[in-house]
Amino acid sequence: MNPTVQELVAALTLEEKAGLCSGADFWHTKAVERLGIPAIKVSDGPHGLRTQREGSTDPNDSIEAVCFPAGCAAAASFDPALTRRMGAALGREARANGVQILLGPAVNIKRSPLCGRNFEYYSEDPYLAGELAAGFINGVQSEGVGTSIKHFAGNDQETRRLSVNSRVDERTLQEIYLPAFETAVKKARPWTVMCSYNRLNGAYASENKPLLTDILRGAWGFDGFVMSDWGAVNDRVKGIAAGLELEMPGSQGVNDRRLIDAVRSGALDEAVLDRAVTRILNIVLLAADLAQRPAAFDRAAHHRLAAELAAQSGVLLRNLGALPLHRGQKVVYIGAYADQPRYQGGGSSHVNTTAVSALDAALLHDRMVQYVEGFPADRDQRDETEFLRAVTAAEAADVAVIFAGLPDSFESEGGDRRHMRLPDCQNNLIARVAAVQKNTVVVLHTGAPVECPWADDVSSVLCMYLAGEGVGEAEDALLWGDADPCGRLPETWPLRLEDTPCYLDFPGDGVTADYREGVYVGYRWYDARRMPVRWPFGHGLSYTGYVYRNAVLSADTLAEQGLVTVQVTVKNSGAMQGAEVVQLYVADTTGTPVAGGRVLQVLRGFQKIALQPGEEQVVTFTLTPRDLSHYDAALHDWYAAPGRYEIRIGHSSRDIRVTLPLHYAGTRLPPLQVDETTPLGILLADPRTAPVVQHALRDETAAMTNGGGDGLMPPEAMAQMFDALTLRNMINFGGPQAEEKLTKLLETLQDAVQ
């Protein structure tokens, strides 16, 4: 009979306990052979296995593996079932290669398009990111391999990521930057969480007790262990006390000794170390047991899956009729990415693989296409001869397809982009080709939005993001109409960098990153400012069409502890099979003031449905009070004001097809701090204090308003001035007894809000 974890912990020496809390090398935990405790192996990455080749001493010498779409592309699928299938495939590959924990998914929020690692991340929206991450984690772990969701938390830039202090207010943190982690933890129970490098509100993530213990374990119920990002530990003793169990990749015994010394000196309670070891061993023994399963995978099948996922993720941004292409047309492919596609980003997630290009796929399917390089893949350099060859070929063709994108040097882990532009050589060629060829198609290979100054001059734009090794086959199917584009944008594409929410603050001064935009990230920002964008969140065109009808709520009113269902019928009104992403947004139209500002609408549901021509399907969503809520920092909890909300269902955040009113019958009211400086407008707007103020200040109100009709001030201005008056201002008109009146009134008001 195998010993229990508790028995193992009791049998370990202090030195062995400390040793189990750090890695043995770059990719392994430590073993304790005398007690039968095995080492386990971890590996990158979130869209393909990057594990060190056996016998190699170079941690970057990786085996060949399947490269699936990066997070930016997978998110465009808007389909957690697809990320689950991708995760399951990665789990099979990991187990076949002796890997017990896969280091992913990465769910940091796309705060700015300039973040160099955006290609790994899912979305600007935490709800979408969380649902996709949960699908991925459930897929990987269904194969007996663990995951490490990362980077927890506030790691939304690469500039000075090892030390920068991300300053985020409580509401913004809880409403934007933590929910994706929360959803994944609650819905998928990842084996591990990886803490980030940065500081969050002054404390390194690796020693941030509110983050690692109070929120992650206390509020969300996480029951795995926390590991550091590679080299992210600042103070090992503080870290283990805060809830960081495993240091990776280890410090060659330096931090082990610090833990031992801290226990012996009394600075660290050995029970805290025992707790960390227990959490690690729970996962290590589970992983070792599941690793006994037979392990194999079909490389060809996984490649086909990668191509399928890439096709499901392609987003048709614009189409005036140039797509789909047809046999018999004279088509020219322009741009080095047609032959050398950019399909993944640089850094720890880089997979050793080979991709099929669009040119390869066209030849395989006997497409009659001409190819001109036009511009290089790896640099911004204009070759005049190639430039003119491309323009000439485009003018002579029926359709010109330009394969554009960002070189690796423009976006990669470790550094942020400096601008949002494509290389000049590409922008110039696109503009010139569009001037001579009305049927110009641009295919984009980027990990994040780029400025598209030529967008109104071309016929069609297809965004592939970084779509993995199957990108060429996917592009071929989408361009030639063998598949319908059904991807949707997981982020807003702004017209220009200056429009972005954190333009003035990203990436900060190198010491501090101030998240001054608050909750206004992505579409929340653009909607609040009624700002035009290039393409909105959730946008994506199709070769077919969809009609929405018969939308209905199960009830007109939502109770405080209740739920309502929303149903809508969606029909494929076109002549081609397709898949629609039905999106549900909630808008708070109660008019209740919200500290930090009210967001106009928030994504609270989405479903991707495949429909044959003429087929229709009823889509159902379920909503609870949490879906109507914002985070209230005074309550330290989620809060929905009673009143009217709108349920908006549509094709994108700015293509709403159906709007339904919903009344929320909540009885809970937010806390209200009352003192002599509280403005009357606030007190009169609150149902608890309004009657008290109206009764107590009748005489003072009359005194203040009697002069309002003498022409000195319009009634509207008088009302605004009255709204701004404080209790002290009003009572001061009461004469000698003002102080006594104020004291009694404050007592009554404070009793009313208890």
Descriptions of predicted regions:
Residues 625-668:
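Terminal connector regions
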Residues 678-741:
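Conserved, compact domain cores that house catalytic/ligand-binding motifs in diverse enzymes
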